[in-house]
């Protein structure tokens, strides 16, 4: 049973997450020759204040 964990910044819509897990499941099934009901996907959303790039919090990053 494949278990995949995805970390992503908060802000994606439910529809986007549904599409993501659907596409990932299809790819995993194809690559690993498993059934969709065997695939587990964990989405972990990270707030912008809990993520840093180049030593700067993403929430404080200038565009």
Identify what each model region corresponds to.
Residues 2-63:
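A domain-level signal for the structural core that forms small-molecule/cofactor-binding pockets
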């Amino acid at each position: 049973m494949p278990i995949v964990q995805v970390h992503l910044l908060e802000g994606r819509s439910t529809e986007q997450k549904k599409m993501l897990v659907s596409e990932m499941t299809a790819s995993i099934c194809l690559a690993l020759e498993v059934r969709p009901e065997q695939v587990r996907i964990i989405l972990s959303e990270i707030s912008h204040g809990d993520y840093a790039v180049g030593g700067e919090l993403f929430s404080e990053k200038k565009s």
